[in-house]
């Protein structure tokens, strides 16, 4: 298999995984638990394990986690999704390659879901510095068995259908009517950024430097006034940038579900066990105020990332990322090719994403006319929708392979430092805020 054909397959599978996840909003989870999703995107991981090498599977997982984190403006989520995704992929690959006679695809999917949930809880516990989050793990493990079985059932049907049609074989693929040459000229990768926003006009590198420093400062602060100043500054930036209220609320909600709720659940369980048993093992020793400060510090980090990616053009950010990764090029790492793959995924999503979502909506609506929740967990029907979508998506493989091979990286992403008057004004305001925090932390105003 040529390098560019492999890249084309990665582009198709990653974009498929992200688009398939849209179906989750139509499928109720039998046991609704905050932070738990069906994980339909993991079907793509299982397909990769069945037909590709482990290295390609890890590449697919890494690209999918990165693209989702950037597009959903939740870059802090990368630590959770990447850790869980990589570990679960390795476990599923091991079971499929070495123990397929002992485990079915459903069983392998359940194992992957268990590992994914465990890894994410451990990461959350480590980041927050709170062991009580581990009390939330049993709830997630029970949910993982259910969601893993559903995902594995669909994945098994998809794998069998792909194997039957020999999609990954050497037989020529049907062509699609989508002209990927036009994608290069129709740049829709930054459609989520309003044209009237001011922050996108700032230099991406200057803005990244400010975001990085501003993310570190809260972890060095001890005075409450410093947190008030930083919060006020971020509120001003939010208003000034013209961010949607929905985006802000989504950021708050996501942080609560992923970080705050597991802690509160674990804390209450710990308190309950202590009241029942009186065992000191369940005592919560840390001050609530210290925990609240830690959560607030992490939220500021979370929200700063949200602001940055919500106001930064994708082409500019990927171009800046290319500059940052320049040292790796000297060691033979194909940075340019990998970034081209990322941009191609984004372009495929923006080009066909709306139409795919409409198609999914119509298909799922026709399956749930009686409005009963269990009628929407129609594994066979959902499998048919997903399999047809995946099979049809490979009709674009030849076009995508040619596009990835011939397109110039400079046409996909670029970055050049350009300091404007807006950058200077932003720098002055940033320096003032940092100066105020420094003098407050040193007690000069107290």
Regions found by a protein language model. Name each.
Residues 1-48, 180-212, 216-221, 225:
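Hydrophobic transmembrane alpha-helices
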Residues 8-15, 19, 60, 81-115, ...:
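Short helix-perturbing small/polar motifs within transmembrane alpha-helices
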Residues 21-38, 61-92, 105, 132:
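Interfacial aromatic-anchored transmembrane helix boundaries in multi-pass membrane proteins
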Residues 52-55, 73-76, 101, 130, ...:
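Transmembrane helix interruption/hinge and helix-loop junction motifs
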Residues 171-226, 230-239, 354-446:
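Transmembrane alpha-helix interface motif
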Residues 251-368:
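Juxtamembrane/interface alpha-helical elements of multi-pass membrane proteins
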């Amino acid at each position: 298999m040529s390098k560019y054909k492999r890249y084309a397959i990665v582009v198709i599978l990653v974009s498929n995984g992200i688009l398939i996840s849209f179906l989750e909003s139509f499928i109720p989870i039998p046991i609704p638990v905050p932070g738990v999703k069906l994980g339909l995107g993991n079907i793509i991981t299982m397909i990769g394990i069945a037909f590709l090498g482990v290295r390609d599977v890890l590449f697919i997982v890494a690209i999918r986690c990165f693209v989702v984190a950037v597009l959903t403006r939740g870059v802090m989520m990368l630590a959770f999704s990447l850790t869980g995704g990589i570990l679960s992929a390795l476990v599923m690959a091991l079971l499929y390659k070495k123990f397929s006679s002992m485990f079915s695809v459903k069983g392998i999917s359940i194992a992957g879901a268990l590992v994914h949930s465990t890894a994410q809880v451990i990461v959350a516990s480590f980041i927050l510095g709170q062991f009580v989050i581990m009390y939330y793990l049993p709830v997630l493990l029970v949910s993982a068995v259910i969601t893993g079985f559903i995902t594995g059932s669909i994945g098994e049907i998809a794998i069998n259908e792909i194997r039957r049609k020999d999609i990954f074989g050497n037989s020529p693929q049907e062509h699609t009517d989508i002209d990927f040459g036009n994608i290069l000229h129709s740049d829709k990768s930054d459609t989520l950024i309003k044209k009237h926003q001011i922050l996108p006009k700032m230099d991406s590198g200057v803005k990244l430097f400010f975001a990085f420093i501003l993310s570190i400062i809260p972890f060095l602060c001890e005075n409450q006034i410093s947190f008030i100043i930083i919060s006020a500054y971020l509120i001003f930036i939010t208003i000034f940038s013209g961010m949607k209220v929905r985006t802000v609320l989504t950021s708050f909600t996501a942080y609560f579900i992923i970080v705050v709720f597991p802690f509160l659940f674990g804390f209450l369980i710990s308190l309950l066990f202590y009241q029942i048993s009186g065992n000191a093992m369940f005592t919560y020793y840390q001050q609530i105020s210290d925990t609240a400060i830690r959560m607030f510090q992490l939220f500021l980090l979370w929200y700063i990332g949200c602001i940055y990616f919500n106001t930064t053009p994708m082409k500019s950010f990927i171009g800046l990322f290319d500059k940052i990764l320049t040292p790796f090029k000297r060691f033979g790492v194909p940075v340019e090719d990998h970034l081209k793959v990322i941009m191609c995924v984004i372009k495929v999503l923006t080009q066909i994403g709306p139409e795919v979502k409409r198609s999914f909506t119509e298909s799922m609506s026709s399956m749930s006319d009686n409005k009963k929740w269990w009628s929407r967990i129609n594994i066979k029907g959902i499998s048919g929708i997903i399999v047809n979508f995946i099979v049809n998506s490979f009709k674009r493989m030849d076009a995508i392979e040619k596009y990835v091979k011939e397109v110039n990286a400079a046409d996909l992403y670029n970055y050049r430092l350009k300091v404007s008057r807006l950058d200077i004004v932003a720098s002055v305001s940033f320096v003032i805020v940092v100066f105020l925090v420094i003098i407050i932390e040193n007690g000069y105003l107290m």
